[in-house]
Design a protein with these regions (language model features):
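Flexible, glycine-rich phosphate/dinucleotide-binding loops
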Residues: 16, 39, 58
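Dinucleotide-binding Rossmann-like beta1-alpha1 core, especially the glycine-rich loop
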Residues: 48-104
Length: 104
């Protein structure tokens, strides 16, 4: 017997699963399809939330990244409450060296 779903999410990485959890919390019936972990992008990012270190030239993109970063502590707390598992989130900053272009 097939079960009707409201939403299909393709990709079981951090973003796809986060979207699925939030939609399901709001009452949607969600299915997530993911090929496998090796091909997912989530494990390559190492959990870095550093929009200032990305040299973003688009003000809109930088604004989006900054707003997302400020929402992250609330989201990780929500995940910990839902799952009973600590996320390990630690807002510790980064060190980003700045190099000047050589003058010739």
């Amino acid at each position: 017997m097939k079960t009707a779903r409201d939403i299909l999410i393709i990709g079981g990485g951090a973003i796809g699963l986060s979207i699925a959890v939030e939609l399901q919390r709001q009452g949607a019936r969600v299915t997530v399809v993911s090929k496998d972990f090796v091909q997912a992008a989530s494990h390559a990012a190492a959990g870095m939330l550093a929009p200032m270190a990305e040299k973003l030239t688009s003000t809109a993109m930088l604004d989006l990244c900054l707003k997302s970063r400020w929402l992250y502590p609330e989201w990780t707390q929500k995940l910990e409450e839902l799952t009973g598992v600590e996320t390990g989130y630690l807002p510790c900053g980064i060190l980003a060296p700045v190099y000047n272009e050589p003058e010739y």
